[in-house]
A protein has these predicted regions:
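Short loop/turn motifs at secondary-structure junctions and domain boundaries
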Residues: 62-67, 154
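Conserved GNAT-fold acetyl-CoA-binding loop/helix
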Residues: 37-59, 70-72
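Acyl-donor (CoA/ACP) binding surface of acyl/acetyltransferases
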Residues: 1-36, 71, 75-184
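Hydrophobic residues in alpha-helical segments
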Residues: 33, 42, 64-65
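A generic secondary-structure signal
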Residues: 59-63, 124
């Protein structure tokens, strides 16, 4: 599948801009890896060494070329310092659907960065003509992420039983969705 091009202007909202992952984001990756949950959800090892974090950065840099989607650093607009990671994943683009995910480094949580990042990611995602809907899948216990989804304009849907393997176990997830506005 051929993906849409990278945005010429970085998606931005509030205090955050989304930019491609760069080598300088190794420190951000290492900080993310200290959250015990983050390594369970992707390819970043827990308490990653510099070499492991560098390898993760390289993998993220290849996601677009592999046809998976867009892997962004969440960076503060005022100094371009990366405070997290988010992705718009397009494996179901042929059906008009995308999925998104986001994570903020533990030391920068509670500043509204996740909501700003999700808003920027959503606006970008819905600007892609083929994307009609973006879904988030969040574990029911993850109250901060549930609130971020709601602040980002996503509507709570159903509990999807056994939706995703996390840490080697199928987990129930709450589906949140947002749709492209219908033009009259």
């Amino acid at each position: 599948m051929t993906l849409p091009n990278w945005p010429r202007i970085p998606p931005a909202h509030g205090a955050i801009q989304l930019r491609p992952i760069e080598r300088r984001d190794v420190d951000m990756a290492r900080k993310l890896s200290t959250d015990p949950y983050v390594p369970l959800t992707g390819s970043l090892p827990g308490n990653a060494s510099k070499a492991e974090a560098s390898s993760w950065v390289r993998r993220q840099q290849g996601r677009h070329a592999e046809g998976r989607g867009f892997s962004f650093a969440i960076a503060r607009q005022d100094d371009d310092y990366a405070v997290g990671h988010c992705g718009l994943w397009l494996k179901d683009l042929d059906t008009g659907r995308a999925t998104a995910g986001y994570a903020i480094v533990p030391s920068d949580r509670g500043c509204g960065y996740a909501t700003d990042a999700l808003s920027a990611l959503t606006e970008f995602g819905l600007s892609i003509p083929e994307v009609l809907r973006i879904d988030l899948y969040i574990e029911p216990w993850n109250i901060p992420s549930l609130r971020t989804a709601e602040r980002g304009g996503y509507l709570r849907g159903q509990l999807v039983v056994g939706h995703q393997a996390i840490g080697g176990r199928l987990r129930d997830m709450i589906e949140y969705s947002i749709w492209r506005p219908i033009d009259d």
